[in-house]
Amino acid sequence: MQLITTENKLAGSKKALEIIEKGITSGEVNTLGLATGSTPETLYAELVKSDVDTKNVTTTNLDEYVGLAADDPNSYHYYMNDLLFSKKAFKESFLPNGEATDAEAECARYEGILSEHPIDIQVLGIGTNGHIGFNEPGTSFDSLTHKVVLTDSTREANKRFFEREEDVPTHAYSMGIKSIMNAKKIILLAFGENKAQAIKETIKGPVDVNCPASVLQNHPDVTVILDNEAASLL
């Protein structure tokens, strides 16, 4: 596990972009795994501004809210189109289908996509409770793409994106921890003091399902990029 501490979110995002650009330019990255939320927004803005050619790169996404259509402004389809896909050309882009009513079939479909498009670099954020994707504490390390019940803390953290608290979905489709760990390389981004405890447990704590991100200690190629605040408890 390589640890990089930077001055702020912009510097950390640029460092992540350097790694991604190098992989794409060298031809080593055919599939790029993407995350959502506030953490990668600056990375995507920098990627849009960059000259790197992504026309031959396929993207996959970690998760999507259950019950939200792709054109819903709160869906991750909308988020990705708004911040990245409408501004940068990719070969193909895949996300779970939030409108799928057969959860088992949807999860199997998405695992099939991941099998066809093995992830070369997976970008991750981390929740204040140590979740990666929407894999909440207690999730099996052997989990594949699954339908998850969102914890109160996760819904609380995400309510700022919604007009009303009751509009925050209660479930999501998420790549499982095993699905994430199958990526050849992982870049974990964390910015802000509110992520410091989760980062401490991820890097310094035991590998334990109560901190899902701690499983990254077992991955052969992980780069953790932090700002000074997120690194403050290390």
UniProtKB/Swiss-Prot annotation:
One of its GO terms (cellular component) is cytoplasm. One of its GO terms (molecular function) is glucosamine-6-phosphate deaminase activity. Pathway: Amino-sugar metabolism; N-acetylneuraminate degradation; D-fructose 6-phosphate from N-acetylneuraminate: step 5/5. It is an enzyme of class 3 (hydrolase). The active site is at D63 (proton acceptor), N129 (for ring-opening step), H131 (proton acceptor), E136 (for ring-opening step). Disulfide bonds: none annotated. Its EC number is 3.5.99.6. Keywords: Carbohydrate metabolism, Hydrolase. It catalyses: alpha-D-glucosamine 6-phosphate + H2O = beta-D-fructose 6-phosphate + NH4(+). InterPro entries: Glc/Gal-6P_isomerase, Glucosamine6P_isomerase, Glucosamine6P_isomerase_CS, NagB/RpiA_transferase-like. It comes from the Bacteria. GO terms for biological process: carbohydrate metabolic process; glucosamine catabolic process; N-acetylglucosamine catabolic process; N-acetylneuraminate catabolic process. Belongs to the glucosamine/galactosamine-6-phosphate isomerase family. NagB subfamily. Catalyzes the reversible isomerization-deamination of glucosamine 6-phosphate (GlcN6P) to form fructose 6-phosphate (Fru6P) and ammonium ion. NCBIfam families: nagB (TIGR00502). This is Glucosamine-6-phosphate deaminase.
